Amino acid sequence: MKPDVGRLLEVAVGHLMGETVPMIGRAYEHSVYEQSNVGVLGMMLLAVRHEHERAAARRVEENQELRRMFARAGTVVGAGDVSERLVAAAEAEDTDLTVSALEESNAELRGLLIELHAAVEEIDSPEARTLEDEIWRELAESTRRRALPTLGDT
């Protein structure tokens, strides 16, 4: 048997919402609170299912985008420690595709993005403003990537 996490979560949500919530309503006179709790649990499991499905892909995509940005940013920032770390980060690759390793890499890259953003804000040039705009676009895109689906999207 090959465990299918997505299918397991679908079945669990179906049981909670289709069987458990109505059963609580029939079994207990004052059950609205517990029914709500089980309903929220079901919705959280749907979110987990969605995140499980996209977890590695989202992190790989974001890490690649950050590295592409860092490759272009070195010339804007100039020489120095941040520039050297940007080059090193841009040349690195994610070879371990486990979610925990990708998340660790992502956290390091996002930390470097914060440093880059701070450095770029101190530079007075059109290239720096263009890079700053790119940083803001990536931050917005990063938020979009993390968005959970609405109930109809699952």
For each predicted feature, which ranges?
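Disorder-to-helix initiation segments
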Residues: M1-V13
